[in-house]
């Protein structure tokens, strides 16, 4: 249990370190942490996706295109991270720098790929962004596309020149990263691009080793199909098969061992086919020569047969080959020792040959039974390699048998033995022909499967091309839509500006109307004054006949009349000038209104054209998209059917493969690996137990020492506490006695004062004074005793304090640590105080600004009052031109109606355009 607990603790430690270091590869936290205080105006607009504000900040020169915020980020980086393609297109069109990096050395393209903003990334790639820039972790944009398993993005990056062999700080290429992250679809896509399969990471691991270590069987299968090296080792000397065995991934181990066995069988097939051709040609020549062959030729043939039999039996079992070779050696030895003039009977020799023939037939049956037994173990019905071996075995045995017959035929001519041998040879020939036909059928099937695979690969490549073309067309359509939206925004801005100009013109017309009113009022007043003067003149003339004495008054009135006429003439001139100015301004405004109408008509026409073009493009692209979607569904269905046929064909191919050599090799490797693992496990367990015992004993000793030290310190602390309490009590008693002494001294002083005042009474108190002095003496003696006791207690306390100092020294370390933490807290408090002071300063500034605003407000109020006074004067003058105003009002109302109609039409068209979009 202790070993298990320590093992779990070690695992927890490793997990903790892994959690600390998991962010070191750069694939976590793709977005930015945004705070408003770190951003400028252009950065806020880029995050919000407001193209107009971005344009305003650039046109007003508040920010530059490539300005950075406080976190070293440009507007392009923030727009790509937050997925704002309109802002990205605008910034790219204004020719900002595309390859500027942030604090982690990441470009805008890397951020767009990392945040899976494909539209932004495609805009950057089309305008020449570099796809091979590496960040501080050594990752390129392709690495982040692989981590997100975004195949379309990876295809675009590779199309624009991304390096498929670029390495990160861990030494991972794109293929190694996809395998390590278990991205199966991405691995299949990258293998089509033919990457370097021999690439290794910083630990010397290939893609196959990483796949076997992670337990991804489909990735291992794909890599084995591309003929990856199975025997590569990492830094620790482990192969992919070793990792599969250690992690108990039996399926992966079986696939790798089968791949090795297939390689060995192919090499054996190639060597055996060459030897079969040589043997068949030599056998035909020997049969043509007949029974006239000599003794050395027989020896050579027997040696060849022995070599052939050794090769076949070595693949099946080693023991049978040794027995057979011994028998063949005995036969050769007997043939060599035989003389031409021996007198042995032919029957004995025939018996020996029959015995040897029986042995060969028995060995042949043994070999076949062993082959069938191994086939039953591996559940294989029949493969091409097995049939080739079956072809070789009977042929070699038949050749041995024919050699024996030819050797025996030189000395005996038994008809029965010859007929038996002919029947055996005919049966063997038939079996060989049947097996050859079976092999030819298998070859034809294999070629058909190869042709099907090539056709499927072509279809897959064509589908990939069509997909890439469709994606490219989609991107072009999106670009055009973005451009059209941008044009519409510009047109809307122009329309808004025209409306603003129109509103300004209306305001100016209102001002002119007010001026006309004032003028009309002035005219009315002047007319009234004229009428009153004329009435006065009439009255004066009527009275002139009656009163001669009023002649002087008439003269005065005549002068006044003359002056009034001059004023009236002057006022008429002013009215004429005002009318002339009003006519000129009216003409100007009419011209401006006509120009605005023409501009509105042009804008309406352009809007109609744009709407028509938009509707046409949208319908066209929708039709193309529907067609492409239909084609894509058809191709996907065909692909699924072809994949099913491929899987069926692959299963058939696997059923035709041989696993004989792999079974034997796997058995040996299993036994050796089991032994090694058991030994290593036992050694590690022993070492772990030994270390655990040492650590436990050391911990127990330390805990005992700690408990002792704690007990001693607690005892000393209690003693110190008691002594301090005793000291406090004694000091309190001394203070009380000192207070009593001070009181008695005060009483003595009072008594002396009374004695000086009242001498006769003094005699009465002499005796009392003596008694008091006696009491004082006693008190002083008690005080001395108490002081001695205090000194003794202090000495004891000093001795105890010396013992406590040692304990306090130990405690001071902890106190220092606490003080350090307190200092840190004080520093934090200082920082907070600084922030508070800054906030106070800002508050003061705000109050000052508030006061300044109040001053400005007062000034504006004064100006408003002056303007009101002026307005009153103008109103007085505008009353004169009221008749003109009525006509202008009618015209203005008609213009307003027309403008309202125009606005409603424009709004309807804009709503229609938005609906179509």
From Swiss-Prot:
InterPro entries: Ankyrin_repeat_domain, Ankyrin_rpt, Ankyrin_rpt-contain_sf, CC144C-like_CC_dom. SUPFAM superfamilies: Ankyrin repeat. ANK repeats lie at residues 71-100, 104-133, 137-166, 170-199, 203-232. The gene is ANKRD62. Residues 439-669, 778-906 form a coiled coil. The keyword Transport does not apply. The lineage of its organism: Eukaryota, Metazoa, Chordata, Craniata, Vertebrata. Residues 265-367 are annotated as: Disordered. The keyword Cytoplasm does not apply. Keywords: ANK repeat, Coiled coil, Repeat. This is Ankyrin repeat domain-containing protein 62. Residues 298-320, 330-342, 349-366 have a biased composition (Basic and acidic residues). It comes from Homo sapiens.
């Amino acid at each position: 249990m202790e070993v298990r607990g320590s093992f779990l603790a070690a695992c927890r430690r490793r997990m903790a370190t892994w959690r600390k270091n998991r962010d070191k590869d750069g694939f976590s936290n793709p977005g930015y942490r945004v705070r408003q205080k770190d951003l400028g105006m252009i950065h806020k607009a880029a995050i919000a996706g407001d193209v107009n504000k971005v344009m305003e900040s650039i046109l007003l020169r508040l920010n530059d295109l490539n300005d950075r915020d406080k976190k070293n980020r440009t507007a392009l980086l923030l727009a790509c991270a937050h997925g704002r393609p309109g802002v990205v297109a605008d910034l790219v069109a204004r020719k900002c720098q595309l390859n500027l990096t942030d604090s982690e050395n990441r470009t805008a393209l890397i951020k767009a790929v990392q945040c899976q903003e494909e539209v932004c990334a495609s805009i950057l790639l089309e305008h020449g962004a570099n796809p091979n820039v590496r960040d501080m972790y050594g990752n390129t944009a392709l690495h982040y596309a692989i981590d997100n398993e975004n195949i379309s993005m990876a295809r675009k990056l590779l199309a624009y020149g991304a390096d498929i062999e670029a390495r990160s700080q861990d030494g991972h290429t794109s293929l190694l990263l996809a395998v390590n992250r278990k991205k199966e679809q991405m691995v299949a896509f990258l293998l089509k691009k033919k990457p370097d399969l021999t690439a290794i990471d910083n630990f010397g691991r290939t893609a196959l080793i990483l796949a076997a270590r992670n337990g991804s069987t489909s990735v291992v299968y794909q890599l084995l199909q591309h003929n990856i090296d199975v025997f590569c080792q990492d830094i620790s000397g482990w192969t992919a098969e070793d990792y599969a065995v250690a992690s108990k991934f039996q399926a992966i181990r079986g696939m790798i061992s089968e791949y090795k066995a297939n390689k060995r069988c192919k090499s054996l097939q190639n060597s055996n086919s060459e030897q079969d051709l040589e043997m068949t040609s030599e056998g035909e020549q020997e049969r043509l020569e007949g029974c006239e062959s000599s003794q050395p030729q027989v020896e050579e043939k027997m040696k060849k047969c022995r070599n052939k039999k050794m090769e076949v039996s070595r693949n099946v079992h080693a023991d049978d080959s040794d027995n057979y070779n011994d028998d063949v050696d005995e036969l050769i030895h007997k043939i060599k020792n035989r003389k031409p003039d021996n007198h042995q009977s032919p029957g004995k020799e025939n018996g020996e040959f029959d015995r040897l023939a029986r042995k060969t037939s028995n060995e042949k049956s043994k070999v076949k039974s062993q082959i069938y037994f191994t086939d039953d173990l591996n559940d294989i019905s029949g493969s091409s390699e097995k049939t080739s071996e079956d072809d070789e075995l009977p042929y070699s045995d038949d050749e041995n048998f024919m050699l024996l017959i030819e050797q025996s035929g030189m000395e005996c001519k038994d008809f029965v033995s010859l007929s038996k041998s002919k029947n055996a040879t005919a049966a063997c020939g038939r079996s060989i022909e049947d097996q050859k036909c079976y092999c030819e059928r298998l070859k034809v099937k294999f070629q058909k499967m190869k042709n099907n695979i090539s056709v499927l690969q072509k279809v897959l490549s064509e589908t990939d091309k069509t997909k890439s073309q469709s994606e490219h067309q989609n991107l072009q359509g999106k670009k055009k839509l973005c451009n059209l939206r941008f044009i519409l925004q510009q047109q809307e801005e122009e329309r808004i500006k025209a409306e603003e100009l129109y509103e300004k013109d209306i305001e100016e017309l209102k001002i002119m109307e007010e001026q006309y009113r004032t003028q009309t009022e002035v005219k009315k007043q002047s007319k009234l004054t004229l009428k009153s003067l004329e009435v006065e003149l009439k009255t004066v003339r009527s009275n002139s006949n009656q009163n001669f004495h009023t002649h002087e008054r008439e003269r005065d009135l005549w002068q006044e009349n003359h002056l009034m006429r001059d004023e009236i003439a002057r006022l008429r001139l002013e009215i004429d000038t005002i009318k002339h100015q009003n006519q000129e301004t009216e003409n100007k405004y009419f011209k401006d209104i006509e120009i605005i109408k023409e501009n509105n008509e042009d804008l309406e026409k352009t809007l109609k054209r744009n709407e028509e073009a938009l509707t046409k493009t949208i319908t066209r692209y929708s039709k193309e998209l529907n067609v492409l979607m239909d084609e894509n569904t058809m191709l996907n269905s065909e692909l699924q059917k072809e994949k099913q046929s491929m899987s069926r064909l692959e299963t058939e191919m696997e059923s035709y493969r041989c696993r004989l050599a792999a079974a034997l090799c796997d058995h040996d490797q299993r036994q050796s690996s089991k032994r090694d693992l058991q030994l290593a496990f036992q050694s590690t367990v022993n070492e772990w137990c030994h270390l655990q015992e040492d650590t436990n004993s050391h911990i127990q000793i330390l805990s005992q020492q700690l408990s002792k030290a704690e007990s001693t310190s607690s005892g000393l602390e209690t003693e110190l506490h008691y002594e301090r309490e005793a000291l406090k009590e004694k000091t309190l008693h001394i203070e009380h006695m000192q207070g009593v002494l001070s009181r008695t001294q005060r009483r003595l002083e009072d008594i002396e004062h009374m004695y000086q005042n009242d001498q006769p009474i003094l005699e009465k108190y002499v005796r009392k004074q003596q008694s008091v002095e006696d009491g004082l003496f006693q008190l002083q003696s008690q005080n001395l005793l108490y002081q001695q006791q205090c000194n003794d207690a202090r000495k004891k306390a000093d001795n105890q304090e010396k013992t406590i100092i040692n304990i306090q020294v130990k405690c001071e370390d902890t106190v220092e640590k606490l003080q350090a933490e307190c200092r840190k807290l004080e520093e934090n408090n200082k920082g907070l105080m600084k922030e508070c002071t800054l906030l106070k300063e800002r508050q003061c500034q705000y109050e000052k600004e508030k006061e300044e605003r109040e001053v400005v407000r007062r000034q504006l109020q004064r100006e408003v009052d002056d303007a009101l006074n002026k307005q009153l004067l103008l109103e007085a003058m505008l009353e004169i031109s009221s008749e003109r105003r009525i006509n202008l009002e009618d015209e203005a109302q008609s213009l307003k109606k027309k403008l309202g109609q125009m606005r409603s039409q424009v709004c309807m068209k804009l709503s229609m355009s938005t609906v179509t979009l």
